[in-house]
Amino acid sequence: MNLHKLIFTNNACYKAGRKITPKGIMVHSTGANNPWLKRYVGPDDGLLGKNQYNNHWNQPMDREVCVHAFIGKLADGTVATYQTLPWDHRGWHAGGSANDTHISFEICEDDLTDADYLNKVYHEAVDLCVYLCGLYGLTEQDIICHCEGYDLGIASNHGDVLHWWPKHGKNMDTFRAAVKAKLGASAPDISVEPEQ
């Protein structure tokens, strides 16, 4: 996993300062054809690239949205994860009670047709979940997507990630199985950016 940290200290969610005890992980995807992390994560740290519209989420916004991490492309095209909230911070991601219990991350979508990109972000997400399970004593059974959260009555009505992954032969069951396999093996290879 290629993990970096750029905490959204200018987002109202961070400023609210509410904490949670993580009981699960919720997987989201952005719903927009833009695989670049710089669209959501900013300002540029030298790896992200410049967001020409300056519409990243690390600033005051007219919407209450914030997740704990994003997975997508850096400026050089490699896939990475950016932590954007402390893992035990209450996010604004589910539109329901999962905000009080779940760590959340968004996977930046492309046009949903690039199997190579999907495989890279999928495996990055598996490694992130293995890492978070290790930190909080969770298992693969504690991982759901936004769509499953809606079915459980703890999230708003969204289709992510089940509108995308099945196009490439993947779903939440294959994802949980991949996390379980890695939890049973050695720890994932994690490159973590040093604290600044």
Regions found by a protein language model. Give the residues of each.
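N-terminal catalytic cores of peptidoglycan-degrading enzymes
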Residues: 1-98, 162, 168
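Basic/polar, cationic surfaces and motifs that engage anionic cell-wall
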Residues: 2-7, 15-19, 101-103, 110-196
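A cross-domain feature marking catalytic cores of carbohydrate-active enzymes
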Residues: 29, 71, 107, 145-147
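Catalytic nucleophile-His microenvironment captured as a short glycine-rich beta-strand/loop
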Residues: 66-73, 102-107, 133
